[in-house]
Design a protein with these regions (language model features):
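Transmembrane alpha-helix interface motif
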Residues: 2-45, 156-296
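Helix-boundary and loop/linker segments of multi-pass membrane transporters
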Residues: 6-10, 53, 87, 130-131, ...
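Membrane-helix interface segments
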Residues: 30, 50, 133-136
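Membrane-interface helix-boundary motifs at transmembrane edges
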Residues: 46-55
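N-terminal leader/targeting helix
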Residues: 55-56, 183
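Juxtamembrane/interface alpha-helical elements of multi-pass membrane proteins
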Residues: 56-174, 290-296
Length: 296
């Protein structure tokens, strides 16, 4: 069965998302932002398919556009004046570029977090942090599961409320508002009760007690070790490039970045390889499957 990047050891998944999320939030060079955004979108497409990726981008792109528009509307710093707004404030190239960069950073972080919630399931989080920080791992795993479960339960509750109404849509804005408020109140109560029941259940099973053992299906295989070496190698090289100033960029007072040299180009290439790791691994696995199928 093909499982792609999600089938790797939880340590591989956790290290990858720690690296790409840190890079998306720290590296503000336009090329790094573009690599991170494209890598996140390609990984999302590889993991979840075209339909879910299109739905995710439907929410992400407007948020990016909003961030790109808001910054030049309120920030007027910068030396290159393009024009003047009706308020009399200047519209500068630097504020516009900073807004675009902020939008790209926001979009890439949102896409990477969507990939992270898909790959880092609750059992993986409990496996990684259950021994060292059992309470934190339980809370974190419940938090990652909360949004999709809350959405499903809200949709189910709305359907039940409509069924009690004879299956008819509520008439008028006021009736629809009452239905929405009632459904939201029911789901909030359900989520609180579910959290308490989960905590009581885990406590009854001895979760978090000293010396407690737990069964795990995860084993560090040879391919996991190679993936860890791959991630640590590219991640360490990108970190060295960032500390050396090879990925530096300045938005104010003028746009300025590190000169492009073979050395700085290698830093960008390393970051590209890092961000597209899930796509590369999925492509390699698909190639092996096709080769195995051709021999049958």
């Amino acid at each position: 069965m093909r499982d792609g990047f999600a089938g790797y050891h939880p340590a591989v998944n956790a290290l990858f998302f720690a690296l790409v999320l840190a890079g998306a939030m720290v590296l503000d060079h336009p090329l790094c932002l573009a690599i991170s955004l494209c890598g996140g979108a390609a990984s999302h497409l590889s993991m979840m398919g075209r339909q879910k990726t299109g739905k995710a981008l439907w929410y992400v792109l407007p948020m990016m556009a909003l961030a790109a528009v808001v910054n030049p509307a309120f920030s007027h710093a910068g030396a290159t004046i393009l024009t003047y707004l009706p308020s009399g404030n200047p519209l500068t190239l630097e504020s516009l570029a900073y807004g675009l960069g902020a939008g790209a950073m926001l979009g890439s972080v949102m896409v990477w977090f969507a990939c992270c919630t898909h790959v880092m399931t609750a059992d993986k989080l409990v496996y990684l942090f259950g021994r060292t920080a059992p309470a934190l791992s339980l809370v974190f795993s419940m938090t990652l599961r909360f949004v999709p479960r809350f959405s499903r339960q809200l949709s189910l509750t709305v359907q039940v409320q409509r069924g009690l109404n004879g299956g008819e849509e509520p008439d008028g804005l006021w009736q629809r508002l009452r239905l929405g408020v009632r459904a939201l109140s029911i789901v909030i109560t359900w989520s609180l009760e579910n959290g308490v029941e989960t905590a009581d259940s885990m406590r009854a099973r001895g979760y978090g007690l000293p010396g407690r053992t737990a069964f795990s299906i995860y084993r560090l295989t040879e391919r996991d070790r190679l993936a860890l070496v791959w991630l640590m190698g590219w991640g360490g090289y990108v970190l060295c490039g960032a500390l050396a100033g090879g990925l530096g960029w300045r938005y104010y007072p003028t746009l300025r970045g590190t000169a492009v040299t073979p050395l700085t180009a290698s830093f960008f290439g390393a970051y590209l390889a890092l961000c597209f790791t899930p796509v590369i691994l999925d492509w390699e696995e698909g190639r092996r499957w096709r080769r195995s199928a051709s021999k049958i």
